[in-house]
Every structure is written in C-alpha cells, then in structure tokens.
Amino acid sequence: MYFIRTLLFSCFIFLYATASAQKTGSAKIQYYKKFKAPKLSTTLGNYRDTVFISPQVADSLLGLSLQISDSKNNPYTISSYNFLYRKIVATENEQTGKVSNTTSVKSSFFKSSPLPELWQNVVRENLRPGEELFFFDVIAKDAQGRVMYSPNLKFILR
C-alpha cells in the first residue's frame, strides 16, 4: 500500500511539474483597432443602385468595368462579385401546346471586371425589355487590404 501511495504521489508531482513548465511561454495577443467601413457605392458607367435602362444602353455598359468608391471618391479594388442575367425565354406547355414566356437565370462568380468576353457575348445576343442584369455580393478591398461589401447594382431593361 505504501508503494502505491508513493507511486501516485510521484506521478502527481511529475504531472504538476510538466504542466507548470508549459506555462512559461505566453502567447502574444495582437489587438486591432476598430474599423468602421465607409459607405461605398458601386457604379457602372454613370449608373448606380437600381436603374431602368434601354437594351442599347445595357449593350454599351457590358464592356465597362465596375467602379467602387466611397463618399470622398477614393477608389477601391474589386475582390470579387457575382453577376446574374435574368432573361426572358419561351416555354411550351406539353399538354396544351401553348407557348408562354418565362424567365431563365444565368449567374456566375467573377474576380475581375469587366465581364469576360464570353459572358458579354451571351448577354448581348438576346437583350430585350423585361430582362435584368444584376451585380451582387460585390466585395471591395481598400489600400490596407481590408475587405468590405459594396452595394448591389441592378439594371432592368425596358
């Protein structure tokens, strides 16, 4: 019994010594200054927010780059964004044979602006009133590398 008690006491001392030895290196904590993101605006050409435009104007805007700036007109770089093209397509009811209009959505994620040539061509071939071009989840970076969301940009063709 004496042997077991001595063995347990020795193990306890050994565990205590190793646990206290690990506490000597303390981790350094870095504190960051709070950052209040400025109010950003997303523009394409001279348009921002939700705008009604003609298909001809939309065609000319497709080749332009998205611009992100704050209220003081400081430019920000685009980290990424999503683009959605909601187009009008015809569908046929198989039972009645009647053709009706509905919408189809094409969307993708991009990291550079303007849109790639392939996407510009896909959108340009069918631009009609009632369709939508939507830039959303626009993420901008400032000069210090901080990321922030910029407002969405939506074009409705009429």
Model features per residue range: what roles?
Residues 11-13, 75, 147:
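A generic structural signal for short, solvent-exposed coil/turn residues
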Residues 91, 95-157:
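Mature extracytoplasmic or organellar-lumen-exposed domains after removal of signal/transit peptides
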Residues 25-38, 145-158:
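Short beta-strand elements
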